[in-house]
A protein has these predicted regions:
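Short amphipathic alpha-helices and their capping/turn residues within compact interaction modules
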Residues: 18, 32-35, 42, 135, ...
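Alpha-solenoid repeat junctions
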Residues: 38, 138, 188, 239, ...
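Intrinsically disordered, low-complexity acidic/Ser/Thr-rich segments used as protein-protein interaction/activation
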Residues: 76-94, 98-313, 317, 321-355, ...
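Alpha-helical recognition domains of nuclear gene-regulatory proteins
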Residues: 12, 29-30, 161, 210, ...
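C-terminal effector modules of eukaryotic transcription factors
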Residues: 297-565
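Amphipathic alpha-helical interface elements that mediate macromolecular binding in regulatory proteins
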Residues: 8-11, 28, 156, 205, ...
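Charge-rich, intrinsically disordered regulatory segments
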Residues: 1-124, 151, 551
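Short coil/turn segments at secondary-structure boundaries
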Residues: 42, 142-145, 378
């Protein structure tokens, strides 16, 4: 019980040390002494409810008759650390997102324009789509498959909310809605590759439908034009892979965007559209060999492909002194060693620049292999055809071009993969576990033709390390898959393709190594995986070639709708 807070005597009686009758407003002693009766202010009672001990005992006695079931532990509403979704988004922003203004470097693609989704509400479709992507890649680096169990719920809610938003006209015309569909499509491709799930085309088709709702391209915002540019690049690579022409509507979008920009990447997409056209024309001619086709048509097509290749060479010459490639030599002994074919290694100003130059090489390889197939097929039915081919389209010239392009892709592998010899984890970001070649290692840099380089868009060493770690092996998947499919695809065509001694086994080994670096399981033989990752005590060449041939079909399917970020 609490004590009585009333004072026992007035201050005057306390000072005189006499007994006080505690009468108010003035006690009897003060009245007799004609003194001012002063009282101390009462002490405020604490706002605490005191319970009599007998009541507490009685309460415990009554409850003891009942069986006590402990409550399960609960997560506090306001935890002292960030939840896993917040950690995943922070990791994604720090290590995946590229600068939207690369200071003279190539345009960054999808990962340079996702900040609006990151900044949006966590419960919006864009916010949930970025959460799904972030949780998926974070689970890969954290090596925690339990995180992926949260993704279907987030993904399903994003799609459900997006479907409601699409019923509103303003939402259909929103840049953020288009970004959401692009992120959902990218997530589908990631899951297809990393977790062997079926890739879907529905989000890609949805993005195309949204662009049609945008109206006249001349009224699009700058960010909308960037998103459409990503879609155009996807359509171009898809058309080349499927040996068809690009849809007329996509061509129209590209023509309008091209009239308002001088971006070299957008011009490269223009050239890619023409590459798809040439490939389609060649396929149609091959089907009509000896039936309603003439040598003049073949000569004209070969000449057109040669002129287009010259445009691609000119494009490379214009950007190479700014973005690379530049020859690189190691500044010191590196362990584990960087795996390079015959010691050849090229560096670029960024991982994104390496990606764009390999896009160019893939276009030129498509033209070269298409020309070579056309010459071989028509040479069988018309022996005098090969003798009358113009010099620039001769078999020897095309073979030399293919070899040079293959060498270029091989020389970009060390830049993207460095000396990595195991699948990545979060520890790789806390300490510089691996070494990646960079422009910072060189005092002087020269372009393809001996001209002094003028590098633009050079990433800092820390940014290059994180981007090479997270995106280098991912971007090399399509390039190495292209080479493996080209060399191991058509058995009748393989003998005509050039390859240096030991180059095909090296390409297959790097392809399998790249699968392991991305934590994509391709065999149950852990010893074989270790040999492929380290490059030491490798199995015979026929084993590497056989394993790569078996795996390339699955990866190629997973890459079908993927736009490299």
């Amino acid at each position: 019980m609490a004590d009585d807070a009333r004072p026992r005597a007035c201050l005057t009686c306390k000072r005189r040390r006499i007994k006080c009758d505690r009468a108010k407003p003035s006690c009897a002693r003060c009245v007799l002494a004609v003194e001012y009766c002063e009282w101390s202010k009462p002490v405020a009672r604490p706002k605490i409810r005191f319970v009599d001990s007998s009541q507490a005992v009685a309460a415990r006695a009554k409850s003891s008759e009942k069986q006590i079931t402990p409550k399960p532990p609960t997560t506090p509403k306001y935890a002292l650390h960030d939840d896993l979704e917040t950690q995943a988004i922070a990791f994604f922003v720090r290590n995946y997102i590229l600068d939207s203004k690369p200071n003279g470097g190539p345009t960054p693609g999808l990962f340079g324009h996702v900040m609006p989704a990151v900044s949006s509400s966590r419960t919006s479709p864009a916010g949930m789509s970025i959460s799904a992507v972030a949780l998926t890649v974070f689970s890969k680096w954290r090596m925690d498959q339990s995180l992926t169990k949260r993704v279907p719920g987030v993904l399903g809610q994003a799609i459900k909310t997006l479907s409601h938003d699409l019923q509103k006209k303003d939402s259909r015309h929103s840049d953020l809605t288009l970004l959401t569909t692009l992120l959902l499509q990218y997530h589908s491709a990631v899951e297809s590759l990393l977790f062997s799930k079926k890739s879907t085309i529905v989000h890609h088709l949805g993005a195309l439908a949204l662009v049609r709702e945008f109206g006249n391209p001349s009224t699009w915002s700058a960010i909308a034009s960037e998103f459409v540019g990503i879609l155009i690049h996807l359509e171009v690579t898809k058309a080349i892979r499927e040996q068809r022409t690009v849809h007329p509507e996509v061509r129209y979008w590209r023509s309008i965007i091209g009239a308002t920009t001088v971006d070299p990447i957008r011009y490269l997409d223009d050239l890619g559209i023409q590459v798809a056209d040439m490939q389609f024309r060649a396929s149609a001619l091959q089907e009509r060999i000896g039936i309603g086709s003439s040598l003049e048509e073949v000569y004209l097509l070969l000449d057109d492909m040669h002129k287009l290749d010259e445009c691609l060479v000119l494009w490379q010459g214009n950007v190479s002194r700014f973005w690379g490639p530049f020859n690189w030599t190691p500044p010191s002994i590196i362990f584990p060693p960087i795996q390079a074919f015959q010691g050849s290694c090229h560096v670029y100003t960024s991982i994104n620049a390496a990606r764009r130059l390999n896009d160019l090489r893939s276009y030129r390889l498509t033209l070269a292999t298409t020309s070579l197939k056309l010459i071989r097929e028509w040479g069988k039915s018309c022996p005098e055809f090969c003798e009358s081919i113009p010099g620039h389209s001769s078999v020897h010239g095309i073979v030399s071009r293919i070899q040079w392009l293959v060498d270029g892709i091989c020389a970009s592998v060390p830049f993207c993969l460095g000396n990595r010899s195991r699948a990545g984890s979060l520890l790789d970001f806390n300490q510089a576990s691996w070494t990646f070649p960079t422009c910072h290692d060189m005092s002087e840099m020269y372009g393809l033709y001996g001209r002094l380089a003028e590098p633009m868009g050079v990433e800092s060493p820390s940014d290059h390390y994180s981007h090479a770690l997270t995106q280098g092996s991912w971007l090399m998947l399509s390039n190495l898959a292209l080479l493996v499919a080209m060399f191991l695809g058509s058995k009748a065509f393989i003998p005509a393709l050039p390859v240096r001694e030991g180059q095909l086994p090296w390409i297959c080994q790097q392809y399998l190594r790249n699968l392991s670096l991305n934590a994509i399981e391709w065999t149950h033989d852990s010893l074989l995986v270790e040999k492929v990752l380290t490059g030491a005590n490798l199995p015979p060449a026929n084993v590497l070639i056989s394993e790569a041939s078996r795996c390339v079909r699955r990866v190629s399917r997973g890459l079908q709708l993927r736009d490299d970020p």
